[in-house]
């Protein structure tokens, strides 16, 4: 997870823990939402339709995915089940290689990679990671009443750990 998203979560937790707070603050962590504008499937569909190339940053890049329905369900589930300060995440299974999605979409379009259409490796963008992290190193997963929704629990005494914030910020600066 990127530093800015992590800081946003920590800000929500700090608001939840504020003395005068009367609002219930929670966060959900999404994977990539299939079919949303800007999603890899939408981009690949367009690239295939115009004859390519299909662009992939790196053959080893993996991402977690969820459907629009799963994203909506996660938000609704968190609203009904979540407690203030919660961070909830959907069990999205194993991460998927982006290049495998590209190859599958090419094949499903009746085309052959390398013959009918090419895959072009473009290189990672500044700040882009090979692997997404759904769970921070300082967190453990806890089951909820819903079998596919997990609660993230901070493993340290303080959920707002300035050392981790500093590490996240350093990582963001180095990655850019």
Stretches with model-predicted labels:
Residues 1:
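Catalytic tyrosine of NAD(P)H-dependent dehydrogenase/reductases that use a Tyr as the general acid/base
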Residues 4:
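Active-site helix of classical SDR
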Residues 7:
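Active-site His/Glu-centered metal-binding helix of metallohydrolases
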Residues 12-176:
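Strand-loop microenvironment adjacent to phosphate/nucleotide-handling motifs in alpha/beta enzyme folds
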């Amino acid at each position: 997870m990127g530093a800015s998203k992590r800081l946003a979560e920590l800000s929500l937790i700090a608001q939840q823990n504020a003395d005068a707070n009367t609002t219930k603050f929670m966060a959900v962590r999404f994977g990539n939402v299939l079919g949303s504008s800007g999603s890899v499937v939408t981009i690949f569909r367009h690239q295939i339709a115009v004859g390519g190339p299909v662009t992939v940053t790196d053959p080893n890049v993996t991402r977690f995915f969820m459907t629009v329905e799963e994203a909506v369900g996660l938000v609704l589930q968190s609203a009904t089940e979540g407690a203030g300060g919660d961070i909830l995440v959907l069990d999205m299974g194993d991460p998927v290689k982006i290049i495998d999605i590209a190859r599958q979409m090419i094949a499903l379009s009746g085309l052959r990679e390398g013959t009918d259409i090419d895959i072009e490796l473009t290189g990672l963008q500044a700040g882009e990671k090979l692997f997404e992290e759904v769970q921070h190193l300082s967190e453990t997963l806890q089951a909820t009443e819903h079998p596919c929704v997990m609660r993230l629990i901070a493993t340290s005494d303080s959920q707002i750990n300035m050392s981790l914030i500093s590490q996240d910020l350093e990582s963001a600066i180095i990655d850019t």
